[in-house]
A protein has these predicted regions:
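Blade/loop signatures of beta-propeller domains
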Residues: 22-36, 135
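Beta-strand-rich domains and repeat architectures in extracellular enzymes and scaffolds
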Residues: 26, 37-69
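Predominantly a core beta-strand signature of beta-propeller blades
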Residues: 37-40, 81-84, 127, 134, ...
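A flexible loop/linker signature enriched in serine peptidases of the S9 family
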Residues: 43-46, 63-73, 88-93, 108-137, ...
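Residue-level detector of Asp-centered blade-edge/turn motifs that repeat once per structural unit
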Residues: 54-55, 100-101, 164-165, 208-209, ...
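Hydrophobic beta-strand positions that form the internal "hydrophobic ladder"
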Residues: 59-60, 105, 169, 213, ...
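Short loop/turn segments that connect beta-strands within beta-propeller blades
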Residues: 77-81, 141-145, 185-189, 249-253, ...
Length: 348
């Protein structure tokens, strides 16, 4: 996000125009049969990774808006539409998530090591993501107070989410020289490495019963691609063109790959039945630019396309009863590539 200080409170009905997000069907595209209604929650800027509080009355999300130059963390009250920035306004943030009970949130931030936004990736090397080494994981109250740094190891620590059991945090770290998944206790102790294959393991979420973890990964077995990966990683970059979805037990055992399509598959999240996973993929677009949501069984069978937007749909999360789904989308944007949050009433 940008190094600027927004007013802490934004009136969503004024600044975000929530009065037009009436939960109608006008935003639902043909073939999107799982959406009963669809309501737009944000209007303008870049808004993504919206995740419910455990009581499902609020969302935490990252946004670049107004005078911001890169993402900060915000909390939205779904009943009133009010939005509050809870991060410092310095550096850049990512990957916010509520603790069980909603007394705390976590997110990753660079503010303690840099006031300005981190440099953008150099696309002369092709399409890449930055794995900014200044990222550490922080906790705070949902109003942004009591900010506390949780990770202190050198290198990238981000992409953290919490088990519904309320006992462990899963996150991605480069502390051992590669991008692997780790878990830790809610106070940051008891760190344990779960993945060890060369490549980028990230974007992990627990199943609703806390027994499994779903994540996306790109692994490199041939020497040429491994060499390119290592070279980019030495510059704090990754090339996320081919990522597959994996599931494992919460202790890291019984890892299995469930997609094999060679596309960019990411943002997986468990359906409340713990037997299916919703995720984003560009598998249907030969050019690789159109991302839609898909459902798949945890054994890799039963792939079903959920959205049919021609640009981007991603970062889905269900409520615990499976009746609502929040996700980010480029649909209905006023300018190209604008990304907003949407809330769907879900039907099977």
């Amino acid at each position: 996000m940008a190094s600027r200080m927004l007013p802490l409170f934004l009136c969503a009905c004024c600044a975000l125009g929530l009065s037009s997000g009436d939960g109608s069907s006008s935003l639902i595209l043909p073939k999107e049969v799982h959406f009963r209604t669809l309501r737009q929650l944000t209007f303008g800027g870049q808004n993504a990774e919206g995740y419910f509080s455990t009581d499902e009355t609020k969302l935490i999300f990252q946004s670049t808006r107004d005078s911001l130059q890169c993402d900060q963390e915000f909390v939205m009250d779904l009943a009133s539409g009010s939005v509050r920035m809870i991060s410092t306004g310095r550096g850049r943030t990512t990957c916010g998530y509520f603790f069980p009970g909603d007394t705390l949130v976590l997110f990753s931030s660079t503010h303690h090591l840099m006031s300005n936004c981190p440099p953008r990736p150099d696309f002369s090397k092709g399409y890449t993501w930055a794995v900014t080494p200044e990222y550490d994981i922080f906790t705070a109250r949902p109003d942004g107070s009591n900010l506390h740094r949780m990770t202190t190891t050198p290198g990238y620590d981000a992409e953290a989410t919490i088990s519904p059991r309320g006992d462990r945090i899963v996150f991605t770290s480069m502390r051992n020289g590669d991008l692997d998944l780790y878990t830790m206790n809610l106070d940051g102790t008891g760190v344990r490495q779960l993945t060890h294959e060369l490549g980028y393991d990230g974007g992990a979420f627990y199943s609703w019963d806390g027994s499994m973890i779903v994540y996306r990964a790109c692994h490199y077995e041939d020497s040429a691609s491994a060499s390119v990966y290592r070279q980019l990683l030495s510059q704090n970059l990754v090339r996320p063109l081919h990522m597959e979805i994996f599931v494992m037990n919460a202790d890291g055992s019984h890892r299995r790959q469930i997609t094999f399509n060679g596309a960019a598959n990411f943002a997986p999240f468990f359906h409340p039945d713990n037997r299916r996973i919703i995720f984003a993929s560009n598998v249907a677009d030969p050019q690789g630019r159109d991302f839609d949501l898909y459902l798949i069984n945890i054994d890799g069978s039963g792939l079903e396309r959920v959205t049919y937007n021609e640009t981007f749909d991603g970062f889905p999360m269900f409520t615990h009863d499976g009746r609502k789904l929040v996700f980010a989308s480029n649909r209905n944007g006023k300018v190209p590539h604008e990304t907003n949050l949407f809330l769907a009433d879900w039907r099977e």
